């Protein structure tokens, strides 16, 4: 009863099955699909806007910056955060056969942050017979006059579902916890930057099973592998 999604600068998650790879495109979207996984990309945003596995909606409805992904985000422009595709997203479809003889189809996002000339690329690939997307990210900056803009921080691929399907977060076989409930989040206490305390909801599953505190760094012990694993509440997703 587990769906394993691998996200990051270079990542993959796959389970081999018989499939027929298809690519469709219209004025607003590009869709990659095989017999099990369907991924739709919004051309005006440069990101995945729909993701279905065996008919199950993995993202839920779009609401702000949730219900979308995977997409590329970073803390790398002079003002701070930037989402690739926010300036001038250009999507390109690629298709071919890899060295194993397996067919693949992909979407490549190209975007340039105009004020600095920083160039962003995000790649998504779907192989015939697999149940996950392969992703790869690139950032380039060429400027001899101003060779240093700021530190490159949080260059990351984000997956932000907006559905009750997802119940747990884990970064390794040894570290797993239930997601904090909506009540716990509503009553959280800010401790410091990106760190919260759930002492107001001591009966919450996250509090009782894992920790009184939550920080965005809690599940970063596997960053060397650039992997994050999510557990799903629905059956028959494996």
UniProtKB/Swiss-Prot annotation:
> Which source organism?
Aspergillus oryzae (strain ATCC 42149 / RIB 40)
Has keyword Magnesium?
no
Q: Note the InterPro entries from the entry.
A: Gal_mutarotase_sf_dom
Q: Name one GO biological process term.
A: polysaccharide catabolic process
Question: What task does this protein carry out?
Answer: Pectinolytic enzymes consist of four classes of enzymes: pectin lyase, polygalacturonase, pectin methylesterase and rhamnogalacturonase. Degrades the rhamnogalacturonan I (RG-I) backbone of pectin.
Query: What is the protein named?
Result: Probable rhamnogalacturonate lyase B
Q: Which gene encodes it?
A: rglB
The opening ranks of the lineage are: Eukaryota, Fungi, Dikarya, Ascomycota, Pezizomycotina
Q: Does the keyword Transferase apply?
A: no
Give the highest taxon in the source lineage: Eukaryota
């Amino acid at each position: 009863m587990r769906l394993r999604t691998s996200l990051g600068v270079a990542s993959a998650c796959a389970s081999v099955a018989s499939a027929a790879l298809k690519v469709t495109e219209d004025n607003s979207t590009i869709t990659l699909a095989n017999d099990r996984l369907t991924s739709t990309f919004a051309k005006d945003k440069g990101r995945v806007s729909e993701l279905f596995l065996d008919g199950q909606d993995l993202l839920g409805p779009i609401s702000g910056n949730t219900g979308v992904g995977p997409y590329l985000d970073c803390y790398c422009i002079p003002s701070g955060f930037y989402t690739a595709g926010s300036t001038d997203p250009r999507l390109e479809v690629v298709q071919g056969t890899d060295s194993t003889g397996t067919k693949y189809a992909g979407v490549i996002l190209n975007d340039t942050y105009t004020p600095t000339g920083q160039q962003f690329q995000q790649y998504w690939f779907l192989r015939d017979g697999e149940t996950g997307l392969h992703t790869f990210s690139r950032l380039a900056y060429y400027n001899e006059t101003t060779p240093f803009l700021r530190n490159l921080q949080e260059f990351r691929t984000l997956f932000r579902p907006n559905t009750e399907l997802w119940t747990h977060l884990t970064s390794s076989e040894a570290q797993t916890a239930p997601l904090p409930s909506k009540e716990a989040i509503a009553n959280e206490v800010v401790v410091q930057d990106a760190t919260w305390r759930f002492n107001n909801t001591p009966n919450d599953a996250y509090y009782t099973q894992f920790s009184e505190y939550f920080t965005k760094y809690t599940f970063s012990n596997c960053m060397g592998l650039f992997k994050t694993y999510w557990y799903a509440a629905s059956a028959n997703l494996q």
